[in-house]
Regions:
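Macromolecular interaction modules
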Residues: 1-261
Length: 261
């Protein structure tokens, strides 16, 4: 068995958003049950809160399909006709050829932190369409596996990460992909702004937690785009609050001190 993820990044014609949502959670989800190796499928909408606000967000929606496939060459392309149903019904706005379907062979399943409440659904996910610096692939993998992944998933509201590499197996339409490395992060937070701000604070050594990330490795190319999405599909949603296995006391103290100034 091999883990894969397929991202369907798309836009929907104005006025047909509810129709697409009903299709995804109705006929489409029913059809997905016939696919071998499908582990999970959910749909997300781009968040107004982004860690890199100047980066364009070309897609309003993303559908995420997670697989554990017995034979990827046979099974992965089977998703294609099911996605084509939405396109054929006019539910995908693609006049600008913005639709993207990217499939990644994942290096592993989720790496999780004590933050993750496994009995609860995610509030959202973020993706990085990433690249490594040429000639430094092994260093890039080591940095993510042994340093940066742990730093990220322990930020309040961030709960897990898994990574992968762009697969040779792709679903039509095959179009330009800006990153051959995928960094997929899971969130459980109803305060994404707090989560993102503390991520940045830890990266800069300014977090009330006292936790500071190591300097970013130059083995990770700056040619990357980051996209945060909120979960919109299914009938179970994050219960509220910010998932964190650590101590919130330093954050509360910092907030109180700021209010007293």
């Amino acid at each position: 068995m091999s883990p894969y993820c397929t991202l369907h990044l798309h836009n929907v014609p104005a006025g047909r958003e509810a129709e697409y949502a009903a299709w995804f959670d109705g006929p489409h989800r029913k059809a997905l049950a016939s696919l071998r190796g499908l582990v999970n499928a959910d749909r997300f909408e781009v968040s107004p809160i982004q860690i890199m606000p100047d980066i364009p967000q070309p897609w309003r929606y993303m559908s995420l399909y997670e697989f554990d496939l017995p034979n990827a060459a046979i099974d992965l392309p089977a998703l294609g006709p099911l996605l084509a149903d939405a396109r054929d019904a006019g539910l995908v706005a693609d006049e600008d050829e913005s639709e993207r379907i990217y499939s990644y062979r994942m290096y592993s399943d989720w790496k999780i932190s004590p933050n993750w409440q496994r009995d609860q659904p995610l509030s959202g996910v973020s993706i990085i369409l990433a690249n490594y610096t040429i000639g430094r692939y092994a260093e890039y993998q080591d940095w993510y596996d042994n340093v940066h992944s742990g730093e990220v998933i322990n930020v309040p509201g961030h709960v897990g990460m898994k990574r992968g590499e762009l697969s040779e197996l792709q679903i039509e339409p095959r179009r330009y992909c800006p990153g051959d490395q995928l960094v997929l992060c899971a969130q459980q937070t109803d305060d994404l702004l707090f989560t993102i701000r503390d991520f940045s604070a830890r990266a800069g050594g300014r977090s009330p937690s006292g936790i500071a990330m190591q300097p970013r490795s130059s083995s990770g190319s700056t040619a990357r785009t980051v996209h945060y999405f909120n979960k919109i599909s299914g009938d179970r949603f994050w219960k509220g609050g910010v998932a964190y296995g650590g101590d919130f006391a330093p954050y509360k103290a910092a907030q109180a001190a700021a209010q007293n100034k």
